[in-house]
Each structure stands twice: as structure tokens, then as C-alpha cells.
Swiss-Prot record:
Keyword Oxidoreductase annotated: no
Enzyme Commission number(s): 3.1.3.-
Record's keyword annotation contains Magnesium: yes
Main location: host cell
Name recorded for this polypeptide: mRNA-decapping protein OPG122
Active-site residues from the entry: 141
UniProt-reported outcome of changing residue 13 to T: Loss of localization to the host mitochondria
Cofactor(s) for this UniProt protein: Mg(2+); Mn(2+)
A Pfam family of this chain: NUDIX
Gene that specifies this protein: OPG122
Superkingdom, taxonomy of origin: Viruses
Organism of provenance: Vaccinia virus (strain Western Reserve) (VACV)
UniProt effect for mutating residue 145 to Q: Complete loss of decapping activity
GO molecular function, one term: metal ion binding
Gene Ontology annotations for the cellular component aspect, listed alphabetically: host cell mitochondrion
């Protein structure tokens, strides 16, 4: 059970009706608590990511493979040298091969680890910049990470999903707001226009009807929730992200 005290969940509960029962999904490095709400009042928060679970026209779920693992990003970010070394020595299995090589040289250490190549997957999105609203944040992040213009993206804003992510490796909590959407492109068309960048190494596409892992469980919860009646919502059913950006 997740005992993290969210900074915004009390406000979300106060102004938005809960739409579905919360679920908890987990793997060997993360515990994620998801709760769906009818979108009655939502605002951007500077410490909460906004992400989109997007379906292609050939019914695939778009997922991004991060260039850097979560652990590597944390090791680089932290200034505490003791913590850097401890994370590296204790959890090097959660790094990819290149990261292990770089850090082994940096610390002059060679941890006993399997020769695995870690890949951390995420949904497109990120932290809103100063002054950005939800549509603007999603438009920018999807363009930067996946190279898709907002004119191809349609978002269901009738509801949203609040997620609390506990990273059990680095012992930190993160919050995220998920929206469900569609892309008026096939998975092949998206791959053709995608350009590997400093955040995203490549793309993968999941089958919404079968699979395993955290990203599949998140998508299944979101897509099942999308079938429910969102009485009292103040959003739109698959509105163009471009139009949402212009309207706001």
C-alpha cells in the first residue's frame, strides 16, 4: 500500500468526482497507485507531470523508451557522492550497459551484476513549464519526444487519472496526471517521422488487448475507465489537441 501523502490529491478529491476504484500495479522497481476522476476542475501543478496514453489508428498504444534509465538520471542528479556510489553498487542491474560502463569508469568500480540492458518505458508527457496549461504542455512534450504535431492528436478530457509513483530503488515519489487520447496516424507512420532525441531513444507499441508490465496495466485501467459514464464532466470527448491549445 502506498502511504505517500500527495500534495494535490486532497484538492483533486475536493473538486472532482471519483470515477473508478483505485488500483495498485507494481514491478521490481515501482509501485503505482492509480485513481480515475471526472474532469470537473483540473489545473497544472509545477511538480506534477502530465502524460497521454495514445492509441494509433491501427489500435496500438504508443510508449516511449527513455534514453537514460531512471536510476542513471538520479545518480547524475544527486550531489551526494556517497549516495551516488551506494545506488551504483547496490542497483547497477537497473542501469543499461552504456550507463554501467560510464559509471564504472567514473567511480573506478566494477560492480558484480548481470549483463542485462535495462530499458525504462514511459508515456509521452512531462512537467508543465511556467505559464503552460495542460493542452500546451502535452502539445510541446509530444512534439519534442515523439515528433507528432498536435493536429494529429485527440484527447478525451472528460476524465483524468491521478497516479502516485513510488520508485523503490531511489526511494522517491512522483505524481502524474494521465489522459487518454488517439493519434490519427498508424504506428508505421509514427515510426517513419520519429527522431531519436536526448530524452527518448525509440518507440514501442503495445497491444491493448493483451500484454504485461506496468505500461500495459496503466493503459488497461485507462481504457477501461474511458468506457464509463462521466456525468458532470467539463471536458470534451476526443477533442483536437490543437483546438484545445487554441481555445485555452
Amino acid at each position: 500500500m502506498n502511504f505517500y501523502r500527495s500534495s494535490i490529491i486532497s484538492q483533486i478529491i475536493k473538486y472532482n468526482r471519483r470515477l473508478a476504484k483505485s488500483i495498485i500495479c507494481e514491478d521490481d522497481s515501482q509501485i503505482i497507485t492509480l485513481t480515475a476522476f471526472v474532469n470537473q476542475c483540473l489545473w497544472c501543478h509545477k511538480r506534477v507531470s502530465v502524460s497521454a496514453i495514445l492509441l494509433t489508428t491501427d489500435n496500438k498504444i504508443l510508449v516511449c523508451n527513455r534514453r537514460d534509465s531512471f536510476l542513471y538520471s538520479e545518480i547524475i542528479r544527486t550531489r551526494n557522492m556517497f549516495r551516488k556510489k551506494r545506488l551504483f553498487l547496490n542497483y547497477s542491474n537497473y542501469l543499461n550497459k552504456q550507463e554501467r560502463s560510464i559509471l564504472s569508469s567514473f567511480f573506478s568500480l566494477d560492480p558484480a551484476t548481470a549483463d542485462n540492458d535495462r530499458i525504462d518505458a514511459i508515456y509521452p508527457g512531462g512537467i508543465p513549464k511556467r505559464g503552460e496549461n495542460v493542452p500546451e504542455c502535452l502539445s510541446r512534450e509530444i512534439k519534442e519526444e515523439v515528433n507528432i504535431d498536435n493536429s494529429f492528436v485527440f484527447i478525451d478530457t472528460r476524465f483524468f487519472i491521478h497516479g502516485i509513483i513510488e520508485d523503490t530503488i531511489i526511494n522517491k515519489f512522483f505524481e502524474v496526471i494521465f489522459f487518454v487520447g488517439r493519434i490519427s496516424l498508424t504506428s508505421d507512420q509514427i515510426i517513419d517521422t520519429f527522431k531519436s532525441n536526448h530524452e527518448i531513444k525509440d518507440l514501442i507499441f503495445l497491444d491493448p488487448n493483451s500484454g504485461n508490465g506496468l505500461q500495459y496495466e496503466i493503459a488497461k485501467y485507462a481504457l477501461d475507465t474511458a468506457k464509463l459514464k462521466c456525468y458532470g464532466h467539463r471536458g470534451c470527448y476526443y477533442e483536437s489537441l490543437k483546438k484545445l491549445t487554441e481555445d485555452d
